[in-house]
C-alpha cells in the first residue's frame, strides 16, 4: 500500500490509508477475500456516462451548437498548410479549425490530416451482472499484481473490469470468453460472496493510449487550424470536461492555459513511431509522480 500511497501523493492526491478492520467495516463484501486493505479517496465519484452525455447534448443545443450524430468524418480539407474544413458522410463542412477528439480513432483521423501521432488504440473489456440489493457504495480499484475495478450501480448491477497486460494494440471491439473468465476469477478472489451473481452482459471498447500516458492537447505546427484533444489513456471521461474548457479558452484567446503546458500536441514530432506499452497501466502514473 505504501507504493500506491506514494504514487497518489505524487499526483497531488491525499489518500487515507485504511487497514483490514476498517476496510471490512466499510465494505463487508470483501470478507474472505485476499488482502482487504486500501487507500480511500474521499473526493472520487462514479457518474453514469449516458446521463452526462445527455446533459452535454442538451446544453450544447441550447447554445446553438449543431450536432451531427452518426456521420463519419472522412477527411480534413486543407490548402497551403491551413485547414479549410472537414469532409463528412453528409458533405463538406467549411471551417478554419478542426478539433481531433476521436478517442481511440484519433491516430487514424490525425493521419487523414497528414499529421502522424503515436496514439495507439488498446482494447479494454467490462461486464455487468444481474441486479442485487445494495451491498457497496464505494467503487473499488486494485493495482498489482492484477489490475481492475468493480462497483455497484444505483440499479443494483455490479460492473467490473480486469486489465489484460498482454493485450494486442488495435481497434478490436469483440468481447471474449478469456476476458470474462479472467475478470470473474480476479473479482472473486477479492470478494468471494459475489460468486452468486450472474453475468448478463459483456462489452469491449478502446483506450486511446500515448507512449508517456499523457494527453495531446492543442494546435499542431504542421497544419494551421488542426487541433488535438486526445490521448487520454482511458481517462477521457474524467479529463474531457476540463480539457474542453481549457482548450476552448485557448482557441478563443490565442493563449495556452498554463495547465496545458505539459501536454503539447507536437511533443512527439520526430518520434511518431514511439511505442505504447500495453502492460502495467499505472506504471506511467507512478513514474510521473516520482518525477514530480
Language-model segments: what does each one mean?
Residues 1-26, 147-149, 186-188:
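Dinucleotide-binding Rossmann-like beta1-alpha1 core, especially the glycine-rich loop
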Residues 19, 69-71, 201:
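Short loop/edge segments at beta-strand edges and connector loops
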Residues 27-35, 77-84, 134, 209-213, ...:
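A short, glycine/Asx- and small/polar-enriched loop/turn
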Residues 38-59, 103-105, 179-186, 232, ...:
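Mid-domain beta-loop-alpha active-site segment that forms a flexible
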Residues 39-97:
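Helical element adjacent to the flavin cofactor pocket in flavoenzyme catalytic cores
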Residues 88-137, 173:
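Central helical "cap/lid" subdomain
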Residues 131-228:
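Active-site lid/adjacent beta-loop-alpha segment flanking the redox-cofactor pocket in flavoenzymes
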Residues 188-292:
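C-terminal catalytic lobe of FAD-dependent flavoproteins
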